[in-house]
Curated annotation (Swiss-Prot):
Gene name per UniProt: PHC2
Annotated Polar residues bias: 265-274, 379-388
Any GO MF annotation of the entry: DNA binding
Protein name per UniProt: Polyhomeotic-like protein 2
Compositional bias of kind Low complexity: 10-34, 230-241, 337-358, 537-551
SUPFAM superfamilies: SAM/Pointed domain
Subunit details: Component of a PRC1-like complex. Interacts with CBX4. Interacts with BMI1, PCGF2, PHC1 and RNF2. Interacts with CHTOP. Interacts with the N-terminal region of the SP1 transcription factor and with MAPKAPK2. Interacts with SAMD7 and SAMD11.
């Protein structure tokens, strides 16, 4: 796809397309100019030429030949990759928004550093030892030298078996200074980490052909990116994402690398890398052709240079010796499917096939390298395969992918047997190129399983550019858990995946994979193609495609996409549609009490939070609308007053209808309403709608109650017991401002039945039954009526009178006087105080404490 994209930068783009069949069929992106000079043909950026808008990010998978024994290290790297993936995801999101021009400027910034590195690397391109030192530096693959440098560095790193060359080579758009070098590096490093489990990955962001010299490898880089492309297949599809260009480069790199590097024994690691690198040169024909034809086979420098030209691509290839074969095969498959979509890729396919062929001759060389880091490389290779299938398969998923799979299978074979060579032997030189389809059935299947295993690793890389965060997290862990995740697709895959992460298992995984691959390989290939195309289609294409590699077989492609989706704002849970808000829920809201608290919240914080809530959840806003009106009518947006006890408190503390401060008040009110007669009932109904009415009602009731008490007290006690109790209660409500006494003042006289609804009613009922004490109570009521309204102002005598007024507490009142308990002390009393200090029994103590609590509340 990227090859097809018009490349404004250099003729290299045209060359890439036109010279697809150029020097090495492996390099679909051969630049006409690069046919001879290979590296200088930096214009090969043509691959990226399509990428300019895509913010091409090349992941140079450094196939550091890590010891398989370092399983723990491998896991750590995977975790680190996951962690960095988060950072990378952020950077990737930012980069996606960056214009290609910005990416190019970034590339230019990095190119400056790369130029120096390249010069050094160009001289030391032949020497892989030089590469490592240079690899550490950020190499802009803008120039072939830089690409070589990266390739060498990666090759060296892989050869050195150093950890992931975390030198994320940010071959960013040379002209895009907009991206900060640190950003690019972070992004690259994160992606590198992603690949790290399989192999050291250097992330190169070759933007357009700013570094035309380096861009020549771009086709190869594109394929390298292919590994990343899976990460960002969708991105590649979109102009900004360099992924797709990357894919071609990956495919291309493997092709030339396969054929060229293998011949060079010294480059055995390089061969692993070189094969990728060679394939990369094949990809970037201009850059790689010389290497393919001359350097690729015999001269390490050539292959190195080819890598350099593909510096990004090569590094990835080098980084993944196994990947190189895998890429060669994988990319061939994808290239075959994508020949129509991308000339580079189709050629890559052929070249990559040759790579295996060429690699076969130097099996020992390749094997050492591959075996040394076979697991990492294998994993990385698989990723590249998976990536390319995903991203490139997107272009021509079904038909081409199957051919690509054969290549992948060979790659898998190579890796499994102990080198890409083995795989290649399975595929004849002509067979791979012409017979991708032939090889597809067997090797593709294995390859595919590898791919699935690899895909997990690659997926992390690809997700970073697009919605990689979730995907990557899953993928990165997947690398470990990939076997399980992938296992869903096929047990063989799972075994392969496990083996690959382990690194040592790789040899066995090859064995496992071949048969499963044969069984499921073809199906996987189609599934992969199908899934890959969806991945490209979807915004989450990167993660989708990477998943596609593994999930295609499972048919998990869509679910993984859903999982990958970073911003899932709507959920359906048990039939309820739940929408997430872009911001955290307000502190005041409790999401558990849907009805009550939402109403409370609507009234309490609606004025402040309503706009936010409307945006937050449709459900909330819908539920709150009715209560909004209610709260407006009440006119108490922040604070509400309980209609029963008159307590003023924050609206969110009020229950349900916002009219009562507690469930007790609501129950008492409801019971009272059923028994109440006209005056209060109509008054209450009005109070529901007007907050001011509440205060008025309270005042009116208080004003009207004292006369009642005086009148009732004048009446004979025996004749009007209920009236007396009512009067007492009303006086309590006035003086104590106790909501419970207030409630009973309204309800008790009219409805003795309601006594059971509350503690105060029970006490009232007890009082009604205690007719013998009625006279005393009446006297107490007379004295009590004159108590100060605020309990804190009571003196000892006031407290004494208050306690005497309580049922059954006449004798205890003396104890209060003896203890000199005034109003303040009374409010501080607890049951244990009463029981321990005054030797009061539990029953009376609880009653007294309940009355004291009512005083406090009032």
């Amino acid at each position: 796809m990227e090859n097809e994209l018009p490349v404004p930068h250099t003729s290299s783009s045209a060359c890439a397309t036109s010279s697809t069949s150029g020097a090495s069929s492996s390099s679909g992106c051969n630049n006409s100019s690069s046919g001879g000079s290979g590296r200088p043909t930096g214009p090969q950026i043509s691959v990226y030429s399509g990428i300019p808008d895509r913010q091409t990010v090349q992941v140079i998978q450094q196939a550091l030949h890590r010891q398989p024994s370092t399983a723990a290290q491998y896991l750590q790297q995977m975790y680190a990759a996951q962690q960095q993936h988060l950072m990378l995801q952020t950077a990737a999101l930012q980069q996606q928004h960056l214009s290609s021009a910005q990416l190019q400027s970034l590339a230019a910034v990095q190119q400056a550093s790369l130029v120096s590195n390249r010069q050094g690397s160009t001289s030391g391109s032949n020497v892989s030892a030089q590469a490592p030192a240079q690899s550490s530096s950020i190499n802009l693959a803008a120039s072939p030298a830089a690409a070589q440098l990266l390739n060498r560095a990666q090759s060296v790193n892989s050869a050195a078996a150093s950890g992931i060359a975390q030198q994320a080579v940010l071959l960013g758009n040379t002209s895009s200074p907009a991206l900060t070098a640190s950003q690019a590096q972070m992004y690259l490093r994160a992606q590198m980490l992603i690949f790290t489990p399989t192999a050291t990955v250097a992330t190169v962001q070759p933007e357009l052909g700013t570094g035309s010299p380096a861009r020549p490898p771009t086709p190869a880089q594109v394929q390298n990116l292919t590994l990343r492309t899976q990460q960002t297949p969708a991105a590649a599809a979109s102009g900004p994402t360099p992924t797709q260009p990357v894919l071609p480069s990956l495919a291309l790199k493997p092709t030339p690398g396969g054929s060229q590097p293998l011949p060079t024994p010294a480059q055995s690691r390089n061969t692993a890398q070189a094969s990728p690198a060679g394939a990369k040169p094949g990809i970037a024909d201009s850059v790689m052709e010389p290497h393919k034809k001359g350097d690729g086979n015999s001269s390490v420098p050539g292959s190195m240079e080819g890598r350099a030209g593909l510096s990004r691509t090569v590094p990835a290839v080098a980084a993944h010796p196994l990947i190189a074969p895998a890429y060669a095969q994988l990319q061939p498959h994808q290239l075959l499917p994508q020949p129509s979509s991308k000339h580079l890729q189709p050629q890559f396919v052929i070249q990559q096939q040759p790579q295996p062929q060429q690699q076969q001759p130097p099996p020992q060389q390749s094997r050492p390298v591959l075996q040394a880091e076979p697991h990492p490389q294998l994993a990385s290779v698989s990723p590249s395969v998976a990536l390319q299938p995903s991203s490139e398969a997107h272009a021509m998923p079904l038909g081409p992918v199957t051919p690509a799979l054969p290549l992948q299978c060979p790659t898998a074979n190579l890796h499994k047997p102990g080198g890409s060579q083995q795989c290649h032997p399975p595929t004849p030189d002509t067979g791979p190129q012409n017979g991708h389809p032939e090889g597809v059935p067997h090797t593709p299947q294995r390859r595919f399983q590898h791919t699935s295993a690899v895909i997990l690793q690659l997926q992390p890389a690809s997700p970073p550019q697009q919605c990689v965060p979730d995907d990557w997290k899953e993928v990165a862990p997947g690398e470990k858990s990939v076997p399980e995740t992938r296992s869903g697709p096929s047990p063989h895959q799972q075994a392969i995946v496990t083996a690959m992460p382990g690194g040592l298992p790789v040899p066995t995984s090859p064995n496992i994979q071949p048969s499963p691959a044969h069984e499921t390989g073809q199906g996987i290939v189609h599934a992969l193609t199908d899934l890959s195309s969806p991945g490209m289609t979807s915004g989450n294409g990167n993660s989708a495609s990477s998943i596609a590699g593994t999930a295609p077989q499972n048919g998990e492609n869509k679910p993984p996409q859903a999982i990958v989706k970073p911003q899932i704002l709507t959920h359906v849970i048990e039939g309820f549609v739940i929408q997430e808000g872009a911001e955290p829920f307000p502190v005041g809201r409790s999401s558990l009490l849907v009805g009550n608290l939402k109403k409370k919240y609507a009234q309490g914080f609606l004025p402040e939070k309503l706009p936010q809530q409307d945006h937050t959840t449709t459900t909330d806003s819908e539920m709150e609308e009715p209560y909004l009106q209610e709260s407006k009518e009440e006119g108490a947006p922040l604070k509400l007053k309980c209609e029963l006890c008159g307590r003023v408190d924050f609206a969110y503390k009020f229950k349900r209808s916002k009219r009562f401060c507690s469930m007790a008040c609501a129950k008492r009110y409801n019971v009272g309403c059923t028994k109440r007669v006209g005056l209060f009932h109509s008054d209450r109904s009005k109070l529901q709608k007007a907050g001011a009415a509440t205060h008025n009602r309270r005042r009116a009731s208080k004003a009207s109650l004292p006369p009642l008490t005086k009148d009732t007290k004048k009446q004979p006690t025996g004749t009007v017991p209920l009236s007396v109790t009512a009067a007492l209660q009303l006086t309590h409500s006035q003086e104590d401002s106790s909501r419970c006494s207030d409630n009973s003042s309204y309800e008790e006289p009219l409805s003795p039945i309601s006594a059971s609804s509350s503690t105060s009613r029970r006490r009232q009922g007890q009082r009604d039954l205690e007719l013998p004490d009625m006279h005393m109570r009446d006297l107490v009521g007379m004295g009590h009526h004159f108590l100060p309204s605020e309990p804190t102002k009571w003196n000892v005598e006031d407290v004494y009178e208050f306690i005497r007024s309580l049922p059954g507490c006449q004798e205890i009142a003396e104890e209060f006087r003896a203890q000199e308990i005034d109003g303040q002390a009374l409010l501080l009393l607890k049951e244990d105080h009463l029981m321990s200090a005054m030797n009061i029994k539990l029953g009376p103590a609880l009653k007294i404490y309940a009355r004291i609590s009512m005083l406090k509340d009032s």
